[in-house]
């Protein structure tokens, strides 16, 4: 039979946004948190709509939904909502939209995703958690205040501080360092256009966070 696979929220957000734009004549932007895939940006650009980047926390996207500003908004931690729907993260609507998408396109999800990648490009994302001592955490916070020039040998083209420190790199990749408010953990997010670059970014993740 067909290979079964789990699809990440990041991938689902890209596919669902594309599906909504292909099947509804809704006006409005797309929104995602700073920690969420730029696949959403690529789909938004393809459909010629604006992209809004928010801090982490669904309330920011919920607010945009409540004011009818966006077609869809979502986060990599599996929360999304759509225009005219509740301003809360709703996994049920996500599942229903995926079912609708598969039924209307008459293709398995794997094909829908590979077709989307062929259309807008491939985006691969990973999240790592690093446990830090208080001393390491203090040093990491100080390090992040300086704008890093390179990450894993790639030039930083832009630093975004919507929530944590996000470095957008020259090769359409990015990394984000965020401190958990509740535990001595640093979250490190990385995204690249190919597996080799992603591996490189993740291998450097801990050293980059600790500034060693």
Question: How should each PLM-predicted stretch be described?
Answer:
Residues 8:
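Polar interaction faces of repeat-based domains
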Residues 1-3, 15, 22, 26-212:
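Phosphate-binding and adjacent anionic-ligand microenvironments
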